């Protein structure tokens, strides 16, 4: 299930190569995590759409760099109704950092997802967060061990998948929060139909997150109708007034 370099877009290949060389933390972390499932339930009880708003200064699929203080962006997203935040810690291609995540988590009271390309157990120890992203395509057979290692530290692992094979592997590894990525990392193309195709394959007790491609309220509604418990949204929130954009998608 590990992706070979030939299967990946050049930008993704470069990200993955850098991730393999990135050092881990010096000491094992222990996390007292804020519950993401509880946050989702509270948002739905309030009649709003659960959105994980992403603090993403830049990316290979966007133009330019947003120079705003990431903490201020995060606060505006929470003020706009974000259920949780996703914070990039990948430095070279997304402009993220572990320090930004630390500052953001101290400044807000919602769950925070660390979004990075984690390849080994030591990389879990770089920084505390409430959730941690594990990409099934990249970690392959190491997924069960990484899910267990993340939980042992107190993290809530969010396992990202794009295919039926990856979804099967995620469920076999015990994942109870699964992100279905509508973006094909081989071509960087987005198809909301990916979520619609895979979501029915997941058990009802698995919390499903629709990732990538949600640009409008209609997109959000489409993903919710297909079974998304929450939406992870980056560009559509970062492009413009982040508070207003978050409010629009969470209504």
Swiss-Prot record:
Q: What class of enzyme is it?
A: lyase
Keyword line: Amino-acid biosynthesis, Aromatic amino acid biosynthesis, Decarboxylase, Lyase, Tryptophan biosynthesis
Q: Which reaction does it catalyse?
A: 1-(2-carboxyphenylamino)-1-deoxy-D-ribulose 5-phosphate + H(+) = (1S,2R)-1-C-(indol-3-yl)glycerol 3-phosphate + CO2 + H2O
Q: Name one GO biological process term.
A: L-tryptophan biosynthetic process
Quick one: which pathway? Answer: Amino-acid biosynthesis; L-tryptophan biosynthesis; L-tryptophan from chorismate: step 4/5
Q: Domain of life here?
A: Archaea
Give any GO molecular function from the UniProt entry. Answer: indole-3-glycerol-phosphate synthase activity
Among InterPro entries, the record links this protein to:
Aldolase_TIM, Indglycph_syn_Halo_TrpC, Indole-3-glycerol_P_synth, Indole-3-glycerol_P_synth_dom, Indole-3-GlycerolPSynthase_CS, RibuloseP-bd_barrel
**What EC number(s) has UniProt assigned to this enzyme?**
4.1.1.48
> What SUPFAM superfamilies does the record tag this protein with?
Ribulose-phoshate binding barrel (SSF51366)
The similarity comment for this entry is:
Belongs to the TrpC family.
Give the matching NCBIfam families.
Indglycph_syn_Halo_TrpC
- Protein name, entry field: Indole-3-glycerol phosphate synthase
Biological source species: Haloferax volcanii (strain ATCC 29605 / DSM 3757 / JCM 8879 / NBRC 14742 / NCIMB 2012 / VKM B-1768 / DS2) (Halobacterium volcanii)
- Underlying gene: trpC
